[in-house]
Amino acid sequence: MEGNSKVSVDNKLRAVVKRTVENVGELEKAFSDKPDALKVYKEIISKEKDAESVWKIITDKKFKHKEVNYELLAYLVKEKFIDIRMFGSAFAVGGFTKAYTGPIQLNWGYSFNKVELIDSSTIVTIMNDGSSTFGKDYRVHYSLLGFNGTINAPAARSTGLTNKDLSVFRNAIWESIPASPTRSKLNQYPKLYLEIVYNEGVSNGQFGDLRNFVEATPKGGITDKQVRRFKDLDIDLDLLKKLIKENKGSDKKIKEVIIKTSVDFNFSL
């Protein structure tokens, strides 16, 4: 973000490439095992007056050394762009046209408990002319949402995703929602994060969508429409625990299980 506007991936690439060509040490690091590629860039830099001029040359359609650009792009993704290492992106800049498939893929969430939609009118601001209008705002009394995702090992090697990146991701996905001040995130809190790490040679997603092993039912004799808080639900994770226990071990599919829980929720294997 710059100010109140989003920075496109192409503009971000442009800024980082320009900073890199201005820094000889960084450029040499990028091409540490590619001396011929480094030579191409240094020859261009020696002839041009500034980084903007270098950028125009290496992104020109007539530039004959596009493979050198891809070497630089691979370095920048692995060293500078943690978001692309996680979720991938497509670059559409001349000389840098390439798509990276993100190792981390998340599905849409759905509610474990039945909900009743409550529609209400809300004021929607039209940003371009400063005016406002009324729109529909759909809410529910309470919903326990579940999300499923995968981390693909081959794609992770392609983008350079590291174990440190994964640690950042786990903390971010756990802490970001309650930290968000937006109206749509109000009163949303994580209860359980569970990640299955497979043994070497076992492809991810072996057990399908793990949400299929979770059941949530109203307790205390109340109906679905009367659910108002987390404590109103009975969460049955027995099938999930059974799945993990039967498949965990050095000679089985599961290597380890990473778990985070809220203070008001207990889950252990």
Go through the PLM ranges and name each one.
Residues M1-L269:
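RNA-binding basic/glycine-rich loop and surface signature characteristic of RAMP-family CRISPR effectors
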